[in-house]
């Protein structure tokens, strides 16, 4: 059957090609100019539709799905400021290498800069934050243009998910009629009667995607592998550092490399390597407490590592980053995108290659001679740190104690999304390694507190695992409208709300002693979040102590629906506990 008009033809062709390329869901926001795309997606039988009233929340929701799946969920919005609301999520996706596909509807070109309603300059709206941009021509039932459209869809998916994944922006212009209104074939908006309906006039007998893209795995050459192997074999004090990476080094490849070298593993909670069966299987320690001891004076007495193999982005932990900065050794950074994720500028070698292929190649013939005393040093430091955390949690409760309990009590499997600011830092320091299938996610590309709830719910929509969101009060407030997705997108979550009434992280900075600190940095708000229970049809409960939290959390992760568990803290008190733990661990290590 011939499409009723050229806009419908164009949109259905684009959507059909995206589906052929593997797309199975979309995030739609209401608007008129995007009607052709909205109808085409909504009526496609193989598309799951997530409807969002707010484009900013929609973009972070799509970001969360992509973090969990590694594949883009297209976003569709109308013209004007709607597209600008995608920008914060685009920045995060760009800087953390997460695939996004943005389909922004636009007006015909003659209306740009004319004063026409809801018309802004959308060309290259996101600047250099996208991997590829295309200003699409106006729809036309012409075979060459439709072949271009199909090829563009294939390229958009390939650019978004390639070796350097990230956002792609297609700016889609439409004239009226925007609805699937039948138009005469001799009308500019009409479709010729002889247009081949099934093939849309340009499929030329192909099955599946119009263009099938294949990407090879970048493996380091033999000379490079041998050079790195020589360094690893000569090392007595080697380390493997796994930084944040949604789709990074696999646990299997890590096991092979760690077993071959004997190097301790320092695993960021966002590396996907701090948790899993390998934690107990490996003979070398998988370390998660380094943030609590690497900055201590006692560690200054340790010998430097003589080689470090690094995967993923720059670590969350500042003490670890500074430890690597001050280490006088070779540091091999494996980065498949060649993105130079190296904020301390200490890497001596950049390997632009696939992490698994690199680790497997290095493990193939490497036989490490790492000193047993080097491993024991980290084992002892880890034990000291976790003993101190356990002892402190039994006597007092602080924000980090909540993260420790969440990590220990989360079901296996589970998806955990951790907010920026203090929650991710406390997760890094107090989330102990565990033999459990925990997928821990966070927005550490630009590290903003915007869109946290929406990103978490997007991740939850892509898995059947229980979802746990740990967020602070400012992040909860900042993205409160994201809670609407709980009902509209059928996502359940356990939300752990750490409420210290403002910006607790600023207690870690020298500005704490300045007269402007309270009003301009800590910014206490005094908000009561309990009314979100009625507004968003969730369950809200405030707990008073550790026993209540552990009981309520254990119940929530086994219960349908969404429960918000609020725990209130004094930010200054929590900061004091962190300092006390640092001193306790340092004193114990110094006395060993």
Curated annotation (Swiss-Prot):
Keyword Transmembrane helix: no
Subunit annotation: Homodimer.
Catalytic activity, reaction form: isochorismate + 2-oxoglutarate + H(+) = 5-enolpyruvoyl-6-hydroxy-2-succinyl-cyclohex-3-ene-1-carboxylate + CO2
Catalytic activity, EC: 2.2.1.9
InterPro entries: DHS-like_NAD/FAD-binding_dom, MenaQ_synth_MenD, MenD_middle, THDP-binding, Thiamin_PyroP_enz_TPP-bd_dom, TPP_enzyme_TPP-bd
Biological role: Catalyzes the thiamine diphosphate-dependent decarboxylation of 2-oxoglutarate and the subsequent addition of the resulting succinic semialdehyde-thiamine pyrophosphate anion to isochorismate to yield 2-succinyl-5-enolpyruvyl-6-hydroxy-3-cyclohexene-1-carboxylate (SEPHCHC).
Cofactor names: Mg(2+); Mn(2+); thiamine diphosphate
GO molecular-function terms, A-Z: 2-succinyl-5-enolpyruvyl-6-hydroxy-3-cyclohexene-1-carboxylic-acid synthase activity; magnesium ion binding; manganese ion binding; thiamine pyrophosphate binding
Family: Belongs to the TPP enzyme family. MenD subfamily.
Alphabetical UniProt keywords: Magnesium, Manganese, Menaquinone biosynthesis, Metal-binding, Thiamine pyrophosphate, Transferase
Organism of this sequence: Haloarcula marismortui (strain ATCC 43049 / DSM 3752 / JCM 8966 / VKM B-1809) (Halobacterium marismortui)
Pathway annotation from the record: Quinol/quinone metabolism; 1,4-dihydroxy-2-naphthoate biosynthesis; 1,4-dihydroxy-2-naphthoate from chorismate: step 2/7; Quinol/quinone metabolism; menaquinone biosynthesis
Cofactor note: Binds 1 thiamine pyrophosphate per subunit.
Signal keyword on record: no
Domain of life per record: Archaea
Top EC class for this record: transferase
Coiled coil: none
GO biological process per UniProt: menaquinone biosynthetic process; organic acid metabolic process; sulfur compound biosynthetic process
Protein's recorded name: 2-succinyl-5-enolpyruvyl-6-hydroxy-3-cyclohexene-1-carboxylate synthase
């Amino acid at each position: 059957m011939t499409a009723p008009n050229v806009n419908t033809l164009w949109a259905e062709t684009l959507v059909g090609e995206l589906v052929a390329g593997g797309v199975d869901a979309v995030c739609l926001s209401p608007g008129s100019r995007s009607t052709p795309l909205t109808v085409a997606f909504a009526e496609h039988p193989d598309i799951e539709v997530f409807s969002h009233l707010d484009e900013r929340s929609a973009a972070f929701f799509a970001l969360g799905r992509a973090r969990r799946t590694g594949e883009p969920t297209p976003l569709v919005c109308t013209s004007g400021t709607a597209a600008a609301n995608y920008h914060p999520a685009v920045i995060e996706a760009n800087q953390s290498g997460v695939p996004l596909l943005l389909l922004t509807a636009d007006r015909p070109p003659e209306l740009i800069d004319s004063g026409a309603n809801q018309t802004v300059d959308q060309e290259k709206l996101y600047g250099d934050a996208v991997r590829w941009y295309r200003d699409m021509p106006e729809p036309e039932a012409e075979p060459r243009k439709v072949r271009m459209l199909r090829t563009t869809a294939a390229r958009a998916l390939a650019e978004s998910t390639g070796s350097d994944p990230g956002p792609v922006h297609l700016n889609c212009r439409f004239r009226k009629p925007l609805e699937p209104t039948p138009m005469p074939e001799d009308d500019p908006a009409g479709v010729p009667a002889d247009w081949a309906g099934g093939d849309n006039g340009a499929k030329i007998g192909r099955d599946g995607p119009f263009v099938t893209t294949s990407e090879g795995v970048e493996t380091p050459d033999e000379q490079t592998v041998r050079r790195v192997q020589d360094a690893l074999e000569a090392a007595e004090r080697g380390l493997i550092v796994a930084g944040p990476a949604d789709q990074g080094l696999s646990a299997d490849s890590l096991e092979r490399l760690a077993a071959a070298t004997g190097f301790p593993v320092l695993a960021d909670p966002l590396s996907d390597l701090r948790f899993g069966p390998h934690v107990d299987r490996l003979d070398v320690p998988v370390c998660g407490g380094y943030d609590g001891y690497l900055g201590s004076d006692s560690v200054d007495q340790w010998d430097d590592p003589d080689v470090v193999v690094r995967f993923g982005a720059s670590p969350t932990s500042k003490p670890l980053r500074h430890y690597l900065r001050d280490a006088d050794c070779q540091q091999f950074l494996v980065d498949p995108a060649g993105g130079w994720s190296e904020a301390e500028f200490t890497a001596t070698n950049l390997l632009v290659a696939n992490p698994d292929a690199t680790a497997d190649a290095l493990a193939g013939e490497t036989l490490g001679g790492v000193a047993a005393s080097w491993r024991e040093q980290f084992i002892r430091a880890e034990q000291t740190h976790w003993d101190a955390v356990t002892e402190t949690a039994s006597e007092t409760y602080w924000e980090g104690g909540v993260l420790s309990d969440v990590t220990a009590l989360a079901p296996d499997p589970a998806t955990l999304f951790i907010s920026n600011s203090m929650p991710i830092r406390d997760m890094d320091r107090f989330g102990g390694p565990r033999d459990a299938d925990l997928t821990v996610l966070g927005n550490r590309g630009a590290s903003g507190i915007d869109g946290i709830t929406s990103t978490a719910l997007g991740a939850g929509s892509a898995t059947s695992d229980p979802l746990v969101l740990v967020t602070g009060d400012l992040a909860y407030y900042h993205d409160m409208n994201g809670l609407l997705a709980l009902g509209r997108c059928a996502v359940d979550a356990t939300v752990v709300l750490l409420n210290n009434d403002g910006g607790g992280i600023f207690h870690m900075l020298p500005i704490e002693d300045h007269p402007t600190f309270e009003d301009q940095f800590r910014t206490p708000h005094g908000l009561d979040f309990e009314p979100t229970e009625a507004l968003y049809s969730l369950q809200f409960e405030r707990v008073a102590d550790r026993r209540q939290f552990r009981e309520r959390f254990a119940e929530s992760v086994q219960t349908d629906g969404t429960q918000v568990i609020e725990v209130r803290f004094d930010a200054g008190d929590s900061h004091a506990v962190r300092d006390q733990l640092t001193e306790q661990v340092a004193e114990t290590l110094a006395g060993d």
